[in-house]
Amino acid sequence: MALSAAASTLARLGYYEKLAGILGIIGLVLLFWQRTRQPFYPDLPLAGETPHRRWFSLRTRFRYYTDCASLFNEAYHTVRFHASTSSSSTLSRLNAHASQYTKHGKGVLLPSVGVHTAVVMPESALDWAMSQPDSALSITHAFADLNQTRYSLGDARYWRDPWQLTLVKAHLAAVTPALVPQLNDELADALAKRLGTDTDSWREMELETTLRRVVAQTLSRLIVGPELCRDEGYLDLAYKVVLGVMTTIFATLPYPDLVRAVTGPLASWHTQRRISRIQRHLEPLYRERLAILRSAKEDQPPDLLMAMMRFAQKKRPEELADPAIIARRVCAANFVAMHQTTIVLTNIILHVLGSDAEFSTIAALRSEAAAHLLSSERITKDAFAQMKVADSVAREATRLNFPLGGRASPRTVMRDGLVSPEGIRLQRGTTVSWLAGCAQLDPEAFPEPRRFDPFRFSRGDGDGEGERDTFVKTSARYLPWGHGKHACPGRFVVDYVVKMALAQLVTKYDLAWPEDYGGKQPPSVWLAELSVPPPRARIMVRRRKV
């Protein structure tokens, strides 16, 4: 009877539900197996645990999934010790040194996803780490593992050698005068399609779902040009691949390589088929761009695909000859550009709508947009530089909602014998990171740190490091773009798109909360260490009569 009931229940479960159940069972087995191994960094303390523990308790690992924000906050400011398991003399001695943790110069271990443990470096080690050569601390190896590129895109090369991304900064500088006005026009078309043009009736929409399509169309103009950026079939596939990469990450990252070899192909099966369909969409463009390269025409399309193929012709000819590789590099560029921009823009709009009435945030944004960015003729680099209110709003919203989880600037240790200035002896193969989300909410750096102050950075208060802190400027207290020589090259694209989107939204549309929200902003949701916009958050829009 019991077996029959179990079989009946299993039959009703979907593919991903069955996969999740199997992975959960495997995870528990591996967790108990891991606890029998040698200690990981025995000289570093375990956040949330009593002194001298060798492994995280199940309670602390469970807390990672249910109360990660406070766990990380403790690790940033201090370490939690439990009176029930420590003598008063031990507590006094340890509390006397509590200020030594990541904010004040000492590393700490934190539970991470699945069976893993994270090595978190102190803030004081950031500049040292960012100055290390890639042969010592590698960002590309860290992100290849984090994004599970071997499975999600079929090969680790797309992040271990991410030339499709490093091209962006130089390419954008060369084409900005011609391309940015085109992006603005594309954005206007995408907003009109999804938000409508009715000036009499309010329309309710799911914010993040709508912005996915708006961002996909706008950034596809940059990445693949006008031929595909309005092709709904291509856009649908492009974002499904983005979501498929996320699914693969969730299905593989928690486990050791042996298990990943099984779960990776299973979780990415649909994604690989969709990438093949994207390749078919790209084939005509690929052949056309090859012909342009062979003819050595000077007048070439300004999109990233053309720049990628031009680079590959000179530096990676074996990749240029394979349209499947080019298609996967386009998908890698889509993943970074579309996913990050959508999350950032969603958080910004939620905070703008939820900002305190005393700030009149929308009125300030409208006034600034009217002065600097309402016509294509005005869309210049200098015009963007004058948009200090929009810049401050974007930085403040991103400060409050770190888009990459609680940790940032991951680096994989590539050789033994590497020792930080604080004396932390790093083990080869370890990935280290920093508690960026906590640093961005530090009350010593930001008065009223959890309050959205749209003008915090336009006043010049910032983090006290001199010049005004802009949306794209990185520091130890602001790491959504990373830091140092490998800071995200695509952040300048996000900067342009966010400011254009804010300008168009506030000048062309009225925005409001649905009645059932009671005028209040819905809170972000924590998924382990990821803070994400509230699922299915809705807003009301109506075209303005202007």
UniProtKB/Swiss-Prot annotation:
EC number: 1.-.-.-
InterPro entries: Cyt_P450, Cyt_P450_CS, Cyt_P450_E_grp-IV, Cyt_P450_sf
Keyword flag Membrane: yes
Cofactor: heme
UniProt-annotated glycosylation sites, renumbered to this chain: N147
Coiled coil: none
Predominant subcellular localization, coarse grouping: membrane
Keyword Glycoprotein tagged: yes
Pathway the protein acts in: Secondary metabolite biosynthesis
GO biological process, one term: secondary metabolic process
Pfam families per the UniProt record, alphabetical: p450 (PF00067)
Protein's membrane topology: Single-pass membrane protein
Record's keyword terms, sorted: Glycoprotein, Heme, Iron, Membrane, Metal-binding, Monooxygenase, Oxidoreductase, Transmembrane, Transmembrane helix
Location in or out of the cell: Membrane
EC primary class: oxidoreductase
Gene Ontology, cellular component aspect: membrane
Residues annotated for heme binding in this entry: C488
Regions crossing the membrane: 13-33
Single Gene Ontology MF annotation: oxidoreductase activity, acting on paired donors, with incorporation or reduction of molecular oxygen
Function according to Swiss-Prot or TrEMBL: Cytochrome P450 monooxygenase; part of the gene cluster that mediates the biosynthesis of fumosorinone, a 2-pyridone alkaloid that acts as an inhibitor of protein tyrosine phosphatase 1B which is implicated asa negative regulator of insulin receptor signaling and a potential drug target for the treatment of type II diabetes and other associated metabolic syndromes. The polyketide-amino acid backbone of fumosorinone is first assembled by the PKS-NRPS hybrid fumoS.
Family: Belongs to the cytochrome P450 family.
Name of the protein: Cytochrome P450 monooxygenase fumoB
Organism, as annotated: Cordyceps fumosorosea (strain ARSEF 2679) (Isaria fumosorosea)
